[in-house]
Amino acid sequence: MNKPKNSPARKMIAENRKARFNFEILDTLEAGLVLTGTEVKSLRANQANIAESYASFEDGEFWLINSYIPEYTQGNRFNHEPRRLRKLLVSRWEMSRLFNSVSREGMTVVPLKLYFNDRGRAKLELALARGKKTHDKRETEKKRDWNREKARLLRDRG
């Protein structure tokens, strides 16, 4: 049976939850990944970590650095290196826009989510972000605590 057209068919693999706390997210975009066969099999087994990774420009190309995709357990001598550089596939226009923002305005590009889209392709949701200062992080934490307290009070009252 076919899936309805409007249903989100994303199969989430990994999420960088600390990115929204450590960075102020300004813009997001979707990028493809150049992967080997054993990397895809390892991702299908929901094994990946993008918490400490970031994206960078080198030699006119866009690369994902420090992402961890463990070796495929059933793989043999053709297995991959777990922390290798992975090329990101974005359009030329998006790449130039990101490069200008990163080089001029002191921003960074961080991955938010790694998932398979509805066609079964591995995609990475990237964010153009600016690092938060310590006082901004404290303010975010206070807001989160207050929202939890409000929810607790309303739940107990009603």
UniProtKB/Swiss-Prot annotation:
Among the GO molecular function terms of this UniProt record, one is: RNA binding
Where it mainly occurs, coarsely classed, is cytoplasm
* Ranges of compositional bias, category Basic and acidic residues: 136-158
Quote any Pfam family the record assigns. SmpB
Q: Subcellular localization, per the record?
A: Cytoplasm
Q: Which UniProt keywords apply?
A: Cytoplasm, RNA-binding
Annotated region (Disordered) at 131-158
A single GO BP: trans-translation
Q: Which family does it belong to?
A: Belongs to the SmpB family.
NCBIfam families reported for this sequence: PRK05422.1, smpB
Task performed by this protein = Required for rescue of stalled ribosomes mediated by trans-translation. Binds to transfer-messenger RNA (tmRNA), required for stable association of tmRNA with ribosomes. tmRNA and SmpB together mimic tRNA shape, replacing the anticodon stem-loop with SmpB. tmRNA is encoded by the ssrA gene; the 2 termini fold to resemble tRNA(Ala) and it encodes a 'tag peptide', a short internal open reading frame. During trans-translation Ala-aminoacylated tmRNA acts like a tRNA, entering the A-site of stalled ribosomes, displacing the stalled mRNA.
Which PANTHER family does this chain map to? SSRA-BINDING PROTEIN, TMRNA-BINDING COMPONENT OF TRANS-TRANSLATION TAGGING COMPLEX
Q: What is this protein called?
A: SsrA-binding protein
Q: Per the UniProt entry, what species is this protein from, by scientific name?
A: Brucella ovis (strain ATCC 25840 / 63/290 / NCTC 10512)
